[in-house]
């Protein structure tokens, strides 16, 4: 036994970082604390002689040595850095120490504090009886490698192999997902350093891919406020040391180290703070909601766009795109989505039904937002009460069926989010502006543009509330009257009736490709206003040529 036993012991490395309310006189913006400890109630002091933290050279006395627990360093800084951490053992033989490379990353402004935990599993092959006893007292576990008779010191590979699968990255809780890199570190210190390197490399690529996929999942989950579920999943995985992957989604923004990013992401989700021997550690773990800044930014974008339109059941993609370029012109958006539109055009027939449904739901969203917001164009509502009343009924009717359809379609849309939302995004704006875009789509495209100054001439004429509703979609009519008034001071009844009819047909329009063409036409005039869910324009603000083009588009649909 003495000659052929393997002992595995776990360590937890982690750090906590948060923004200071006010920077220090030296310009330090963050307070951080980094620590090394044992899992849960394990006292690593039994086998750890000291822990050496190598801070950045910019710190005074960058070599910090802790000979007694808690093994931690607290400092203030303005940037993250890679910190080598050496754990020295109370061992009279090799290995005498193990060195970890720790990524001390900080949270960006506006993001939650960092609460990061990294679990490492150290595997000691054939330790001396004395050192083995110390390891066991610190929570170490005896592991008998298969084929113990043949596996003794000459073959370090056996112990290492088990460590790799066991290693889990970024355990926010106290999971002991050894990084594999650490296992490799220990083993390398013992016998084979090359193994350690290879393990780390393997683990990192896995982490990268996992973090990417997980980041996407996280974004969706956050939009749905499913942090709790993700947390539960993470907990379930903890024992397996595999739970890090789901939380990995949060990339550590400040740092490039994928491992810690994953850890961080897990820590945010692994909400349960591991009971750390040092109290500060425990508290640090709770805040572990520090999502990597990037994911959080993406999530914020998506969530904001979704927030405005999630109720109508609009595809998340649409919303994300809308929030994407908050201040880019719709034209840019159209160009970016042009590619998607092309792809869509081919399968468009097959997915036509879906698109129509989505456009309906989007339209409804636009109605809601517009009726609530009554954009400036709405305020410029037409001066004819009769036309106003006409507008209202048409919009109200469209709203009723839209909502019912949206409710029916929401479930379908969620299932078809990827394909349909992709289509919507593509259709939203085609570089040539030929892409089909439902009003809501164009709205989402321009929702980013909502910051764009409304180019519609503020109508001096009465702003009837009904018109604000009409704007629900583009409120083409309400907006249209004011400009014509501005231009001519008066307008003939025949033309007004024509515009009223045009408005009615626009509001009843459901063909996505035609909607896109109309949006493109209006964009060229510059007389439109964009909100989170609507694309508003004033028919009276358009010149007669543009109105004729709109009518021709509708005629094409009718035929």
Swiss-Prot record:
Residues 56-58, 78-80 are annotated as: Acylated histone binding. PROSITE patterns: YEATS. GO terms for biological process: positive regulation of DNA-templated transcription. The keyword Transcription regulation applies. The record marks 103 as: Acylated histone binding. It comes from the Eukaryota. Residues 1-138 form the YEATS domain. CDD domains: YEATS_AF-9_like. It is found in: Nucleus. The modification N-acetylmethionine is found at residue 1. Residues 147-484 are annotated as: Disordered. Residues 180-190, 200-263, 325-355, 474-484 have a biased composition (Basic and acidic residues). Residues 305-324, 369-396, 437-454 have a biased composition (Low complexity). Residues 409-421 have a biased composition (Acidic residues). The keyword Ubl conjugation applies. Chromatin reader component of the super elongation complex (SEC), a complex required to increase the catalytic rate of RNA polymerase II transcription by suppressing transient pausing by the polymerase at multiple sites along the DNA. Specifically recognizes and binds acetylated and crotonylated histones, with a preference for histones that are crotonylated. Has a slightly higher affinity for binding histone H3 crotonylated at 'Lys-27' (H3K27cr) than 'Lys-20' (H3K9cr20). The YEATS domain specifically recognizes and binds acylated histones, with a preference for histones that are crotonylated. It is linked to A chromosomal aberration involving MLLT1 is associated with acute leukemias. Translocation t(11;19)(q23;p13.3) with KMT2A/MLL1. The result is a rogue activator protein. Component of the super elongation complex (SEC), at least composed of EAF1, EAF2, CDK9, MLLT3/AF9, AFF (AFF1 or AFF4), the P-TEFb complex and ELL (ELL, ELL2 or ELL3). Interacts with ALKBH4. Component of a SWI/SNF-like EBAFb complex, at least composed of SMARCA4/BRG1/BAF190A, SMARCB1/BAF47/SNF5, ACTL6A/BAF53A, SMARCE1/BAF57, SMARCD1/BAF60A, SMARCD2/BAF60B, SMARCC1/BAF155, SMARCC2/BAF170, ARID1B/BAF250B, MLLT1/ENL and actin. This is Protein ENL. It comes from Homo sapiens (Human).
């Amino acid at each position: 036994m003495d000659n052929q036993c393997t002992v595995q012991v776990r360590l937890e490395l982690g750090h906590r970082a948060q923004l200071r309310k006010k920077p220090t006189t030296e310009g330090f913006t963050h307070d951080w604390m980094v620590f090394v400890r044992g899992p849960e109630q394990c006292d690593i002091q039994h086998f750890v002689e000291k822990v050496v933290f190598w801070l950045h050279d910019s710190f005074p006395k960058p070599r910090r040595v802790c000979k007694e627990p808690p093994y931690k360093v607290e400092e203030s800084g303005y940037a993250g850095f890679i910190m080598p951490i050496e754990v020295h053992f109370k061992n009279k033989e090799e290995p005498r120490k193990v060195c970890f490379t720790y990524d001390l990353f900080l949270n960006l402004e506006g993001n939650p504090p960092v609460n990061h935990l990294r679990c490492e599993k150290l595997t000691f092959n054939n330790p001396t009886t004395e050192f083995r006893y110390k390891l066991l007292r610190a929570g170490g576990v005896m592991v008998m490698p298969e084929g113990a008779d043949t596996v003794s010191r000459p073959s370090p590979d056996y112990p290492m192999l088990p460590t790799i699968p066991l290693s889990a990255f970024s355990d926010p809780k106290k999971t002991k997902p050894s990084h594999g890199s650490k296992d490799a570190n220990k083993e390398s210190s013992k016998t084979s350093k090359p193994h350690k390197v290879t393990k780390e490399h393997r683990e990192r690529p896995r982490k990268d891919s996992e973090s990417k996929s997980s980041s996407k999942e996280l974004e969706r989950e956050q939009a749905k406020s499913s942090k709790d579920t993700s947390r539960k999943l993470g907990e379930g995985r903890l024992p397996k040391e595999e739970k890090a992957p789901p939380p990995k989604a949060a990339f550590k923004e400040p740092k490039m180290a994928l491992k810690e990013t994953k850890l961080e992401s897990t820590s945010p989700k692994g909400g349960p703070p591991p009971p750390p021997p040092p109290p500060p550690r425990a508290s640090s773990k709770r805040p572990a909601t520090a999502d990597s800044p990037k994911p959080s930014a993406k999530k914020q974008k998506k969530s904001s766009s979704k927030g405005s339109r999630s109720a109508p059941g609009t595809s998340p993609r649409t919303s994300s795109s809308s929030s994407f370029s908050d201040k880019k012109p719709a034209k840019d958006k159209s160009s970016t989505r042009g590619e998607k539109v092309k792809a869509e055009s081919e399968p468009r027939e097959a997915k036509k039904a879906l698109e129509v449904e989505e456009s309906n739901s989007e339209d409804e969203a636009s109605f809601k937002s517009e009726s609530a917001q009554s954009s400036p164009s709405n305020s410029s509502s037409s001066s004819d009460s009769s036309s106003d009343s006409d507008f209202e009924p048409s919009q109200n009717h469209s709203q009723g069926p839209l909502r019912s359809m949206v409710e029916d379609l929401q479930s379908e849309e969620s299932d078809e989010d990827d394909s349909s939302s992709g289509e919507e995004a593509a259709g939203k704006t085609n570089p040539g502006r030929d892409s089909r875009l439902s009003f809501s789509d164009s709205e989402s495209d321009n929702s980013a543009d909502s910051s764009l100054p409304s180019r519609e001439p503020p109508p001096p004429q009465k702003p009837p509330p009904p018109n604000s509703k009409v704007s629900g979609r583009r409120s083409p009519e309400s907006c249209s009257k004011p400009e014509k008034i501005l231009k001519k001071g008066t307008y003939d009844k025949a033309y007004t009736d024509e515009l009223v009819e045009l408005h009615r047909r626009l509001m009843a329009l459901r063909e996505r490709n035609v909607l896109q063409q109309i949006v493109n036409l209006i964009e060229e005039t510059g007389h439109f206003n964009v909100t989170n869910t609507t694309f508003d324009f004033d028919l009276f603000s358009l010149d007669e040529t543009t109105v004729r083009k709109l009518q021709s588009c509708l005629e094409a649909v009718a035929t």
